[in-house]
Amino acid sequence: MPNVKLPDGNVKHFEAPLTIYDVAHHISPGLAKAAIAGRVDGVLVDTSYLIKEDCSLIIVTEKHEDSLEVIRHSTAHLLAQAVKALFPSAQVTIGPVIEDGFYYDFAFERSFTPDDLSLIEVKMHELAKANLSITRRELPRNEAIQYFKGLGEEYKAKIIADIPENESLSLYRQGDFEDLCRGPHVPSTGFLKAFKLTKVAGAYWRGDSNNEMLQRIYGTAWADKKSLEEYLYRLEEAEKRDHRKLGKALDLFHFQDIAPGMVFWHPKGWTIYQELEHYMRNRLVDFGYQEIRTPQLVDRSLWEKSGHWANFRDEMFVTETENRHYAVKPMSCPCHVQIYNHGLKSYRDLPLRLSEFGNCHRCEPSGALHGLMRVRNMVQDDAHIFCTEDQIQSEVAMMLELVQSVYKDFGFTEIKYRLALRPEKRVGSDDVWDKAETALKLAMQGRNIEWVDAPGEGAFYGPKIECSLSDCLGRIWQCGTIQVDFSMPARLEASYVAEDGSKQTPVMLHRAILGSFERFMGILIEHYAGKLPLWLSPVQAVVLTISEKQNEYAEKVRKTLQKRGVRANFDLRNEKIGFKIREHTLQKIPYLLVVGDKEVENCQVAVRTRDGIDLGVMTIDTICDTLTQEIIRKGSI
């Protein structure tokens, strides 16, 4: 008879098999009422799951981290049930859980409208309020195919037909609706209290553009209404901060169909870009990097040697001329090895730190393109360090110091670190992997960094550290990477002469901090809602005249600011000062310097911030000092 070990270490002995619900009720009726699911020996299951033998058990309530997956999966079924109730001719396909929510794809003769979504949501609340029991049963594969064909659900029958014949399938029923699903699900629809349908979009059947178009309804679901409201607020804020909208409103960049996924930088946007590049270049010099430049078009022979042609070919832009095949580089690593290989290297030359603002192209699917966040042409702050195995720890420690310093200057202090460890299929001996993984851990410990291990998620050629930023809405953006590579140097015949005179292969460390300039700019724009820190703002101050009598003085103020390194402009238009202030505030210019007759007479400016704060009057020297000091401080405000 089963012994059940609970999270607190307590072991409960039972005389007969029993369900997770029964165990919860044995502990307390309140726990049984709150139980959503269970985790038996690490596997997530329904509360109706029958425990027949000894196991460890976690009872999942809405407070447990597993609860949202179960709630969202069940809400996807609730959505499908509501759609079938309102639109019986609609056919169901799949409805998985995604980040922060779920979706369900339907085949229907017409497009769902916003009014339809409202009706569907009302019906979902009605079904949830009915507190319908959710039950599970199993069917053999062939019976399941015939069952769904009998319901007119051809798509579901096709899905089942792809499953091996000897498999038994699970179906979940709630009321008069039944769907194919592995589960688990909540015990009844009454557990689904906080959800919202967010949008409808097109989606190809099985993700293939040659197949018919389906309709995908997206939604979100949470354990309670407070969490739902907080999420919807974040969603609303994210919509306001959308870098594509702000990019247009602030005249930073645009995209066109003539160059999908490639940015047309406007003067203001290019100013930000150049500031990023200038900043990174200076930081890299401080840390001993040598900047290089490698070709855009490279013969396929290099990509074949590096392994990219076999594994990355579909994502490369290729061309042919004079009977030779070339690829536009999707990454800079193989080219950096060519520079390393140019000339004999000794152990005394290591570590060798090479950096490039690598202009790369990748043939991303058109449907995946998303403003600056997903592009086909990107510039990466790419660097590769060639070193010995014994130098890995010290080099990684130096990289982490640089990463933390750079992110701080951009105003990001909450950094999450993840250590991707060896996968089953890998190159290199266990001893080498032990050494590399230990070096990465010790480097992080030396910087007082806390991290999460990700077993099995390293690349086949080495472990890596992933550095992710948390923005003002709590969204996580993976930007930085520190990757150990045991493979590419050997594939491309990189070597050095060791102290004992032997020929050795160096370790290659791939390193990016921003990731791509384009994506990082998108993150910055959304994080700051367009109100970039002073040092990054394309226009840092604008001088506003009250009348044309101050034009000459305004020009003098602007020139003085520019000589002190401030990006300044002026507005001499014959418009009311209130109109000018509003217009430049909407353009999110950090400082508005108003000049009238009194300011001209006293050689001063009246200073306002873009947030409407009146800083009073200042002399020209004072405002210059104020702005230049803030620019120097960067994110340390």
Curated annotation (Swiss-Prot):
It comes from the Bacteria. Residues 1-61 form the TGS domain. Its cofactor is Zn(2+). Binds 1 zinc ion per subunit. Keywords: Aminoacyl-tRNA synthetase, ATP-binding, Cytoplasm, Ligase, Metal-binding, Nucleotide-binding, Protein biosynthesis, RNA-binding, tRNA-binding, Zinc. It catalyses: tRNA(Thr) + L-threonine + ATP = L-threonyl-tRNA(Thr) + AMP + diphosphate + H(+). GO terms for molecular function: ATP binding; metal ion binding; threonine-tRNA ligase activity; tRNA binding. One of its GO terms (cellular component) is cytoplasm. GO terms for biological process: threonyl-tRNA aminoacylation. Its EC number is 6.1.1.3. Its main location: cytoplasm. SMART domains: tRNA_SAD. Zn(2+) binds at C333, H384, H510. It is found in: Cytoplasm. Residues 242-533 are annotated as: Catalytic. It is an enzyme of class 6 (ligase). It holds the Pfam family tRNA-synt_2b. Belongs to the class-II aminoacyl-tRNA synthetase family. Homodimer. Catalyzes the attachment of threonine to tRNA(Thr) in a two-step reaction: L-threonine is first activated by ATP to form Thr-AMP and then transferred to the acceptor end of tRNA(Thr). Also edits incorrectly charged L-seryl-tRNA(Thr). This is Threonine--tRNA ligase. The gene is thrS.
